[in-house]
């Protein structure tokens, strides 16, 4: 009898739970369940150099680093063969659709002593000339939206195997030309961000009697403040992301 009562109680409780789950949710409850993280200034995630782009964006743990390595892993510039270097690139964007959208990148580095390096970079993204209109389709003027970021980086080698680097970044984005829409004044957005980079390298003995090289790289990119184009709108994150990579070198 006791067992029967227990089962009946469980059945009633379960039915009540299912009934509560089937209750329609209010719009306020639905809004509270939305936890999508939105970001802005996506141009910060564009691959700046053709070398890493051709290899599928695997620049975090490259052997033989060059000037562009400051964007992928600042700590890897310690291993650059040359004392100084610079790189400049330009990529047309959606060239088959428009002719005035493009991404430009300029970077350079210099070694300081035997165990340190500094770098600087600028990336610029132009969205081309745009005709703005009001809600009725009447033209309100033309503007060329543009975005840019200025970087300054430093790297140091703590041991023969371990090095660390940081990048500090100023971000500017102007998409509206300081226009007002629907009673809201829009402006250029500014913000700050930074990268933290780590590199660990070691050697393992190979079958041919030599040593193979292994590198592990990590880059936490765009750790920064929220940005907004209007004081009346919510602020959005910059696109923070994590990059990890492994490099292996074997002499044949």
Feature locations, PLM:
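Subset of outer-membrane beta-barrel
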Residues: 21-252
